[in-house]
Amino acid sequence: MNRQEQIKFIEDNYPAYTNHHSKRRVRHDFFNNIQTELQAYLLGFYVSDGNINEKRKTFRIHLQERDSELVYLYKDVISPDARVFSVAPHEVTGRNGAKVQASGSFGVDICSTILCRDLVNLGFGYSKTYSENHLPKIDKSLIRHFIRGYFDGDGSIMWWYQKADPKWKKNERIRSAVSICSKTNTILLDIQEFLKRHDIKSSICFANRDQMYQMSIPKSQLKKLYNLFYEDSYFYLKRKYKKFNHYVNTEETQLIAEFRNAQGMSASNSNNSPTSVEHPTK
């Protein structure tokens, strides 16, 4: 099913209705039976970057303003009448007590006891961040869409420019990798096993600085991961897709030229002492 066909399928098979608690229409059974790419993707994104409130029985997605497209997707598909909210840019305390400026954010709250119950039954309940989560028991053809959703929430595309090193006869180059993070390693181990079945290599380590586990997929595997994620797929974070597509399908010489232009470097300056500059894109 294409994008519109999936949305029509949801509208026909998961009716939105009100109840005595609220006059807002909600597709309370949206996560009860995962049958489409759309449901699997939104479930994966929720697992990495959403939450449910046990007391209020409220499902929440709260993202940076630049990713508001996903907030509206949750709203339009699950609860067309739900209210969205925004938070203005503000100062927060970052790593080592440093004050940093947080960007504006955007979110949606959906009240539904049934929706929250189904997420708990799927294994992604009220304390999922620190729980030993696993890939959900859904149709195998939908797992890649769940993982893409998880990646859009807690994954990063990283690339490094590395200067030439005449001593070791190494030319300047672009190095890149994809990382996916989690507070526990169980879901990453499941993802790793799934990727292995698709001939995609990865590694998992514990990042002490961030106190979380990190899966890394090296540059040599990114084309295969890109195809697994996006081939015949209709739901994804556009910003990440554009970055991923650019890094995977652009010649390395062009990426090097783009880096030089961005840094105001000439070709001769880029061949000085070896160094690397990291550019993560979450």
Which residues fall in each region the model found?
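Internal intein/HINT superfamily modules and their associated LAGLIDADG
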Residues: 1-282
